[in-house]
Amino acid sequence: DTYGMEESEFRSLLKKYELNPISIGASYDELKDDPKGVAQKALRYGARFVMCSWIPHKGNRFDIENTKAAVKIFNKAGAILKREGITLAYHAHGYEFRPHEYGTLFDYMAQNAKNFSLEMDVFWITHGGEDPISLLDKYPDFVVMLHLKDMEKGLKGNNTGSASVETNVVLGQGQIDIEGIVRKAHQQGVRYMFIEDESSRVINQVPKSLSFLRSISIK
């Protein structure tokens, strides 16, 4: 998202303020229809990762056919990106944790991922009914980045991939074990962890979240 600016203008602004993008976003359709174009865009930004945050599906009906199609597209696009030194990462939103055979649809994705990894959004993992730390233990080599977003206490999750942005709270003040997740991810060599806050209180909350992260003792 370039906030309405032309890409060249946006990149100039990043350069002016010495902001170096680690990752850029790409839609499912972009990866399906023009993965080479996605790779070139990432190279223009100097990004090492491309993240896709949504697999299209009708309403709340996400199933194994959607999952298999996505895995095929991600593996194909990921191979093209990999040739340019770029890693493709999928950002799960919780609807992937529906039961499938002896696990979940997410398990199918993780076990068949040849050319893509995971950007773990700890809010959506939790909201979808899974435990981020358990998932890090189960797939230690699959996670390459984290979105750190805490969930207000008392909120009950589901696997729709939908929740009010106002349920985003200061890191460490919600129901998610942010400290434990950060420590586990650090132990596993995850280098990039991004604070994400989509609430209307973001300006006030992010400094507090950053202060909380700085208070975590990493050994």
Which residue ranges define each predicted feature?
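Conserved beta-strand positions in the central sheet of alpha/beta enzyme cores
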Residues: D1, S23-G25, M51, A89, ...
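Acidic/histidine-rich catalytic cores of soluble enzymes
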Residues: L81-Q175
